[in-house]
Amino acid sequence: GVCGELNCKPLTSVVLQGLFSHLMVGVNMVNAPTIAKQRDITIREVRSDEAGAYQTLISLLVVTENQSRSIRGTLFNDEPRVVEIKDIPIDAKLGPNMLYITNRDKPGLIGNLGSVLGDAGVNIATFHLGRADEGGNAIALIEVDGTPPEAVMDAVCELENVVQAIAMRF
């Protein structure tokens, strides 16, 4: 779509900065491409003018020796939205404080999660769900008011059918 015509270098630099900032200090969008090159990390920018379901769609695939992760995003009314994570469709508007939860798609998870957060005084602002298939892998992106304390995140991780729970701040 429209993104196929754009200069992707600044976006690539910001993505690299975000990936490296969790591993080292002093990373910025100017030096991130150089750090990638020094570490023999292969970067491929692929563009397509092919029209699809979205007028603009940006996909990110990170492949390591141990795993691969993917995410796709677009713009709806000039607001960024996540539309796919690890091949699981989702429609999520991001907020400043988010919980990223991977889980098995089983009954009771949403209620139990809401109870843990509510009992701790953590307010849910938005709740976005996606699943691969019935009873299979699922993802929740939840906007909350404030960053949940570590003890709350530990309680979320201990819920039945939760595989992983991460607090994110944007």
What are these regions (language model features)?
Residues 1-170:
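A conserved regulatory-domain signal marking ACT and ACT-like small-molecule sensing domains
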